[in-house]
């Protein structure tokens, strides 16, 4: 199926955990819906923290979504009448999402993606840096540091209340029981070498 629209683009919303990425994605989707645009919302199957079927922000705002295991599945859910495609937790998808989202924008869709730009180690996370490079618009949000109240750009993983080691697995789906927002100065990663 080849679908061509008037104009398309890719918007990326990124930042640390608790910075409001999902909330901003939901806000943009609601505005598109108010404008009578047809919207399709997607999230990765791995993200089941708050709901199996919905994109849910940490403050409880939610929106029904299609749960997919691979970005290729997006194509199965869209049609010529679709105007906007929104994808939450984009960092959990493989490299193919970069090409899929770019192709969707090339075909005229407004594509909104949201995800973590850094992992708990403070390093670029998955596909997000490459999406930042190809997006027409990048919005980087900040949370509030749980230690000092300064703007927080990092995600602190905690294990039994202590900072996780650099050697721990990068992906661990969780929320406030496992993570906090931290500023540059209070972000700790034991065993990290500079």
Curated annotation (Swiss-Prot):
Pfam families, per the entry: TK
Subcellular location per the Swiss-Prot or TrEMBL entry: Cytoplasm
Disulfide bridge partners, by residue number: none
Catalytic residues (UniProt): 89 (proton acceptor)
Binding-site list for Zn(2+): 145, 148, 183, 186
GO cellular component: cytosol
Domain of life assignment: Bacteria
GO BP field: DNA biosynthetic process; thymidine metabolic process
PROSITE patterns registered for this protein in UniProt: TK_CELLULAR_TYPE
Name the UniProt record assigns to this protein: Thymidine kinase
Lineage: Bacteria, Bacillati, Bacillota, Bacilli, Bacillales
